[in-house]
């Protein structure tokens, strides 16, 4: 057995049968089966194309190669593009190619086969050996091919429940690759028609990857569009907020709301109160319940020499009412309420209720 394409085999080459080692089928198909001598060769694709012409084939009928490959093939005895196919089956060195497509393999005594499945996308290979591969690096033997296993055509997709799926009606020696259970000719080089058992896995895998890649690209485009739209929306919202802040000075308004009225800066015109008021000296701490009508009775005769403070037409002595004098500045007024800043305190003087109130900043 000379496999000239051994370089393309990345996993192993093995013989599944020894000559003259057969087991009589426990369940016979409708048509008699002659003993066959297939050799199963597992090819794990490594992004290459495999050519059936390079594989030794002792079958005199070379036109049947396309019917015996679990893969996407064309009429030039050449596998199609397998860049996205991870594995495929090649069946060669056999007698009676029409027997290979028969779904009953109870007549074959399989010694053992070790198969490493690189992808868990497919738990079973949809070829005639369907059910053989179920997990990674698992040893399978002839016990997997018992009479209890349903070896009917698993790839019948014609939705005809009354159709016999044993592929007994397929003309597998036809060069036109009648790969459908309905005996329709497949003249498409890419085998777009529904394939039979032996090419179904490769076709299904190939179709799956094209479908998967197609939708993967669509999903990628959709995700990029979605991300772009969301980014644009966020930038637009930020721009609107920035314009509102710039136009309406929302920061200042928010500060005023948070700190009530005490952060509003408005210059008090000195002409309203006179120079004495703006240059007056106030104590660090005002008496909380100081009434502005409270007057100093010593008629300005104070030993400290401090000038009487005149506010709102009333006058009172600074020393008798205040212990320490420090300069404070008028920082603003709102609705006749005046604020005097001294250290960390705001002093509110309301001429309507005539009370001086201590406010902590």
UniProtKB/Swiss-Prot annotation:
This is Uncharacterized transmembrane protein DDB_G0285607. Residues 150-198 have a biased composition (Low complexity). Residues 53-75, 150-211 are annotated as: Disordered. It comes from the Eukaryota. GO terms for cellular component: membrane. It comes from Dictyostelium discoideum (Social amoeba). It is found in: Membrane. It is a single-pass membrane protein. The keyword Acyltransferase does not apply. The chain crosses the membrane at residues 225-245. The keyword DNA damage does not apply. Keywords: Membrane, Transmembrane, Transmembrane helix.
């Amino acid at each position: 057995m000379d496999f000239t394409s051994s370089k393309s085999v990345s996993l192993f080459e093995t013989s599944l049968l020894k000559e003259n080692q057969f087991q009589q089928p426990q369940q016979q198909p409708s048509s008699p089966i002659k003993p066959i001598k297939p050799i199963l060769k597992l090819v794990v694709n490594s992004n290459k194309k495999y050519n059936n012409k390079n594989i030794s084939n002792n079958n005199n009928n070379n036109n049947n190669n396309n019917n015996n490959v679990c893969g996407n093939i064309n009429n030039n005895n050449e596998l199609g593009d397998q860049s996205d196919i991870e594995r495929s089956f090649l069946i060669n060195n056999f007698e009676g190619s029409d027997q290979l497509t028969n779904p009953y393999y109870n007549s074959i005594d399989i010694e053992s086969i070790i198969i490493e499945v690189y992808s868990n996308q497919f738990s079973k290979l949809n070829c005639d050996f369907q059910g053989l591969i179920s997990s990674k690096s698992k040893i399978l033997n002839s016990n997997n091919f018992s009479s209890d296993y349903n070896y009917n055509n698993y790839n019948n997709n014609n939705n005809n429940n009354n159709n016999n799926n044993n592929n007994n009606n397929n003309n597998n020696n036809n060069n036109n690759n009648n790969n459908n259970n309905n005996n329709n000719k497949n003249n498409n080089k890419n085998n777009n028609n529904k394939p039979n058992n032996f090419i179904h896995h490769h076709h299904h895998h190939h179709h799956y990857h094209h479908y998967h890649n197609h939708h993967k690209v669509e999903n990628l485009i959709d995700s990029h569009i979605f991300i772009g739209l969301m980014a644009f929306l966020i930038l637009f919202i930020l721009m609107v907020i920035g314009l509102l802040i710039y136009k309406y000075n929302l920061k200042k308004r928010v500060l005023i709301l948070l700190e009530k009225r005490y952060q509003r800066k408005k210059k008090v015109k000195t002409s309203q109160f006179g120079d004495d008021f703006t240059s007056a000296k106030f104590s660090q701490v005002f008496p909380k319940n100081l009434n502005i009508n409270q007057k100093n009775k010593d008629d300005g005769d104070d030993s400290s020499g401090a000038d009487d403070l005149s506010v709102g037409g009333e006058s009172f002595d600074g020393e008798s009412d205040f212990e320490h004098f420090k300069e404070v500045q008028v920082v603003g007024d709102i609705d006749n309420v005046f604020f005097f800043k001294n250290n960390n305190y705001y002093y509110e003087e309301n001429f309507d209720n005539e009370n001086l109130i201590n406010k902590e900043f």
